[in-house]
């Protein structure tokens, strides 16, 4: 919407250009760990190794502080690693950045839950400052009749479990296994997360996948006179949707029936 070429022809995709530049930078070795010449002697604890924690820790280490990142999971990345499927974003993109951050001096403490493995009082005693960079992992619920029936799951439970499965991470024995194999799947929500659930369900061998979208079907062509910061409405089909999902528009879920 921000590219003026869109008024007359195909616009230039800024995201694609930026991604190509970054990939080339890593391939050619142009992106290297920065050498920190001056240290402050200050120690900072960063809680959470998601996008915010990674960005924060790199800025702090470059400012000369000693930084330790505490992460409850086995690996860093947050929802980039555990929420976005591998078929949509390869995790090497995260790994190469974490390698750079670690080479600059950031220490990562994995499988560490604050309040369980280490207390806030201990952190306050050991560090000069503590930064909270935890992400939001609480999904938005659907308060309708039948919501508590078996077989209804949050994307926040479904997607991270599959990501751990494909990366050969151990899934907790206390966690209910969620698989779409040989099932007729309904995905409520027409956004990116819904598309991720579609692609994951298809790869798990679902019999069918239907996506319900509360909004009406948008036009196939956008209003080219509408420019940034407005978002032009246009029918978009993700790669996951094109793999075989049925899409139903203008549908509001009012209840769920079954056993």
What are these regions (language model features)?
Residues 1-24:
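Iron-sulfur (Fe-S) cluster-binding segments and ferredoxin-like electron-carrier domains
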Residues 18-259:
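Residues forming the flavin
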């Amino acid at each position: 919407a921000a590219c003026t070429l869109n008024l007359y022809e195909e616009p230039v995709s800024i995201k694609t250009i930026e991604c190509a530049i970054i990939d080339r930078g890593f391939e050619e070795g142009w992106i290297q760990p920065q050498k920190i010449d001056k240290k402050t002697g200050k120690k900072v604890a960063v809680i959470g190794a998601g996008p915010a924690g990674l960005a924060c820790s790199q800025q702090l280490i470059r400012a000369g502080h000693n930084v330790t990142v505490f992460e409850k999971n086995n690996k860093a990345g947050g929802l980039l690693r555990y929420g976005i499927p591998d078929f949509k974003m390869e995790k090497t993109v995260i790994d190469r950045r974490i390698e750079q951050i670690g080479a600059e001096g950031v220490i990562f403490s994995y499988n560490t839950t604050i309040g369980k493995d280490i207390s806030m009082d201990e952190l306050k005693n050991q560090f000069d400052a503590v930064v909270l960079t935890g992400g939001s992992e609480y999904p938005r619920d659907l308060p309708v009749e039948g919501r508590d029936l078996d077989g209804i799951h949050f994307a926040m439970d479904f997607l991270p479990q599959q990501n751990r499965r494909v990366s050969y991470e151990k899934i907790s024995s206390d966690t209910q296994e969620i698989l779409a194999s040989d099932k007729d799947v309904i995905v409520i929500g027409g956004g990116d997360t819904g598309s991720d659930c579609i692609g994951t369900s298809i790869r798990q061998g679902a019999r069918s996948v239907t996506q319900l979208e509360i909004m009406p079907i948008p036009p196939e062509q956008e209003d080219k006179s509408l420019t940034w910061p407005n978002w032009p409405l246009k029918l978009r089909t993700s790669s996951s949707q094109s793999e075989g999902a049925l899409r139903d528009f203008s549908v509001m879920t009012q209840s769920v029936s079954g056993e």
